[in-house]
């Protein structure tokens, strides 16, 4: 396939806001590509040349791309810079100035050159990147150049999510979504949709079934549902294991021989943050190849008191890591093992995985196994919960004893019970920032005064609004919000956002914030859950807690289904409170 033809599909996707139409366009595209192209096209749809967990970035600013355009299009740099200020989109500038009708490269040729650009480093690499990008711009159709430039700048933003791509892969083969579960299972244990698509194109469903857990490929993490009372846990699980819930940094640690990689909840490779943990893994899992999960949490070495998440995540800064290790030492509380010496343990029941974890771990200071109790008594669960709260922890997680580890799934195999605050929702909501409103009055100087936030509809692959928030952040945080959001602002509402509210500035759904609210109410202006009866759901008196939650991506946000469940729990609690007063 020529890159110009792929660009035409990108154009069609960009012009539609209908998910089914988008899926059908993708399915039509996939039917036309072969096994050497399918993985590359999947990566390019996400504006990348590798899966998300691989730290491969183009590293080219607007200025460098303008240099490449000037070189390729033979237009003076000053003229391009002036035009860019007027147009605001370097992709559209390529269309305006390119005279390359009739020229083109294949998708594979274009992808391979982009991959080379992303991997160039060292002395002379900047000029080499500019020259290679100029070659591509000069070799592609104007429309192809438009999308090429957007890919390099990280501004492709077609609004295509992984669920839509998985549906389209199935539809391309059998004209329905029937193969989606096989594709999704393979994706959940590899986190690499390009690889999964290539295997599917080469060997069909049987090849997908043969995909196994591999050390080095992060597994999409299992997630817990929520309830508001210990009695509900027993009602759903019966006899179960109960563990503390830490306010830490959830880690998935992969060790093969002497190599260790540490992935965050949103599958970022954060190994650099934890040199002390890497050392501990090598010591406490000697001669074992493992994938384990746990919660890393910083503590005060003098008092033993745990610090909140915001302290642990300070290690995300790529400088002074050794200083942070000394200042904020951390403990890893391991709670699961997903692979051990060649065996995929995800299909084993919880109780067997726990035994294998205990057998594999050598005792040491840095890594310990999360304590647990096994009970069918709600009073014992409540007592354990209160003990955890007294220790400054978030709450508890209950786990079904016979449940496998279900990668990428949120269900009632795991149930969390978190601290409830008087007059507040029993749990916070992880919201995605969708846009912002310019400040008025005192906040006019910041250029930002409120955020439009939403939650994720995982059935429709859309982000839906749930609140406009103007309280919580400090003045310094408002300034930081403006800086990071302006880097991802877009001209119009993104295709994967459903909203009746028009903020002053739309942004790509990327950043997650933790929101506390008093309750969930019905709303005619918000789109969360509105397809049920025409009324949406909204957060009453919402406020942002802290800054951006860096360990979570947009698809890790609270879902519409969770909001509906929280609303039902809230109504149930009110009925019970009222009956207590009678």
UniProtKB/Swiss-Prot annotation:
It is an enzyme of class 6 (ligase). It catalyses: ATP + (deoxyribonucleotide)n-3'-hydroxyl + 5'-phospho-(deoxyribonucleotide)m = (deoxyribonucleotide)n+m + AMP + diphosphate. The keyword Magnesium applies. PANTHER family: DNA LIGASE 1, DNA LIGASE 1/3 FAMILY MEMBER. Its EC number is 6.5.1.1. One of its GO terms (biological process) is DNA recombination. This is Probable DNA ligase. The active site is at residue 245.
């Amino acid at each position: 396939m020529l890159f110009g033809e792929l660009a035409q599909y990108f154009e069609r996707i960009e012009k539609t806001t209908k998910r089914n139409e988008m899926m059908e366009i993708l399915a039509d595209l996939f039917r036309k590509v072969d096994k050497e192209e399918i993985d590359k096209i999947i990566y390019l749809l996400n504006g990348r040349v590798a899966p998300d967990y691989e730290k491969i970035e183009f590293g080219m600013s607007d200025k460098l791309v303008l240099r490449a355009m000037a070189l390729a299009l033979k237009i003076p740099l000053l003229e391009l810079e002036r035009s860019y200020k007027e147009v605001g989109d370097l992709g559209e500038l390529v269309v305006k100035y390119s005279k390359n009708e009739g020229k083109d490269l294949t998708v594979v040729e274009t992808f391979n050159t982009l991959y080379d650009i992303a991997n160039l480093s060292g002395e002379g690499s900047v000029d080499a990147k500019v020259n290679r990008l100029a070659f591509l711009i000069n070799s592609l159709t104007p429309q192809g150049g438009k999308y090429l430039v957007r890919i390099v700048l990280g501004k492709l933003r077609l609004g295509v999510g992984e669920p839509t791509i998985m549906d389209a892969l199935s539809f391309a083969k059998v004209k329905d979504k029937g193969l989606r579960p096989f594709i999704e299972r393979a994706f959940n244990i590899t986190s690499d949709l390009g690889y999964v698509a290539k295997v599917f194109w080469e060997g069909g469903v049987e090849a997908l079934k043969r995909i196994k857990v591999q050390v080095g490929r992060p597994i999409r993490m299992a997630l817990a549902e929520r309830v508001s009372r210990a009695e509900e846990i027993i009602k759903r699980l019966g006899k179960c294991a109960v563990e503390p819930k830490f306010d830490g940094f959830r880690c998935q640690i992969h060790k093969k021989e002497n190599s260790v990689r540490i992935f965050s909840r949103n599958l970022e490779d954060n190994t650099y943050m934890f040199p002390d943990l890497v050392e501990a893994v090598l010591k406490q899992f000697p001669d074992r190849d493992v994938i384990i999960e746990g919660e890393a949490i910083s503590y005060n070495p003098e008092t033993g008191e745990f610090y909140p998440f915001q302290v642990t995540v300070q290690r995300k800064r790529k400088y002074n890591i050794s200083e942070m290790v000394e200042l904020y030492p951390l403990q890893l509380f391991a709670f699961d093992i997903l692979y051990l010496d060649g065996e995929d343990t995800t299909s084993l029941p919880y109780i067997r995985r726990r035994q294998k974890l205990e057998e594999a771990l050598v005792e040491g200071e840095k890594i310990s196994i999360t304590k647990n109790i096994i009970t069918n008594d709600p009073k014992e669960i409540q007592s354990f919960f209160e003990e955890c709260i007294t220790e400054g922890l978030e709450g508890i997680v209950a786990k079904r004893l016979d449940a496998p580890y279900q990668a990428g799934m949120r269900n009632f195999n795991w149930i969390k019970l978190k601290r409830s605050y008087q007059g507040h929702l029993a749990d916070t909501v992880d919201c995605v920032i969708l846009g912002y409103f310019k400040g008025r009055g005192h906040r006019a100087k910041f250029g930002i005064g409120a955020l439009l936030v939403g939650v994720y509809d995982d059935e429709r692959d859309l982000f839906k609004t749930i609140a406009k928030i103007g309280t919580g952040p400090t003045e310094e945080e408002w300034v930081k919000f403006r800086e990071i959001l302006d880097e991802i602002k877009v001209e119009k509402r993104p295709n994967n956002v459903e909203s009746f509210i028009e903020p002053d500035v739309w942004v790509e759904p990327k950043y997650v914030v933790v929101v506390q609210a008093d309750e969930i109410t019905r709303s005619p202006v918000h789109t969360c859950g509105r397809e049920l009866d025409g009324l949406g759901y909204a957060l009453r008196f919402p406020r942002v807690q802290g800054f951006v939650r860096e360990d979570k991506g947009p698809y890790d946000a609270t879902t519409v289904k969770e909001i509906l469940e929280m609303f039902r729990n809230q109504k149930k609690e009110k009925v019970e409170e009222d009956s207590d007063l009678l």
